[in-house]
Amino acid sequence: MARIAGVDLPSNKKIEIALTYIYGIGRTTSKKILQATGVDPNKRVKDLTEEEISKLREEIENNYKVEGDLRQEVAANIRRLIEIGCYRGIRHKRGLPVRGQRTRCNARTRKGPRKTVGAKRKEK
């Protein structure tokens, strides 16, 4: 099992897919990394040599923001939006959809489970 950017890559998968287990690397970025390092995308992780693993590790560390650094940057961006009090920041603070989706009947993922309000009975 190869360890790159603090993530154990699954050894039975192709390296092109295995790199996507790293936060911040998708299929397109994975292909770019493999092309830059000259590693065969169809090779399995268990078949990689130490030299290829170190090339991949070096390429990712020097040219891409991944895992903890990327998570910190995203959190800082959201914190900044909240601090300046813009519309997007307010939506983040209230836990509502940020990108203009309707909230009257949907948005359950952002709003969480329904808070049912009990109806008051009329006393006799």
UniProtKB/Swiss-Prot annotation:
Keywords: Ribonucleoprotein, Ribosomal protein, RNA-binding, rRNA-binding, tRNA-binding. One of its GO terms (molecular function) is tRNA binding. One of its GO terms (biological process) is translation. Pfam families: Ribosomal_S13. Residues 98-124 are annotated as: Disordered. Gene3D superfamilies: 1.10.8.50, 30s ribosomal protein s13, domain 2. It comes from the Bacteria. InterPro entries: Rbsml_uS13_C, Ribosomal_uS13, Ribosomal_uS13-like_H2TH, Ribosomal_uS13_bac-type, Ribosomal_uS13_CS. HAMAP family: Ribosomal_uS13. Belongs to the universal ribosomal protein uS13 family. Part of the 30S ribosomal subunit. Forms a loose heterodimer with protein S19. Forms two bridges to the 50S subunit in the 70S ribosome. Located at the top of the head of the 30S subunit, it contacts several helices of the 16S rRNA. In the 70S ribosome it contacts the 23S rRNA (bridge B1a) and protein L5 of the 50S subunit (bridge B1b), connecting the 2 subunits; these bridges are implicated in subunit movement. Contacts the tRNAs in the A and P-sites. This is Small ribosomal subunit protein uS13. It comes from Dictyoglomus thermophilum (strain ATCC 35947 / DSM 3960 / H-6-12). The lineage of its organism: Bacteria, Pseudomonadati, Dictyoglomota, Dictyoglomia, Dictyoglomales.
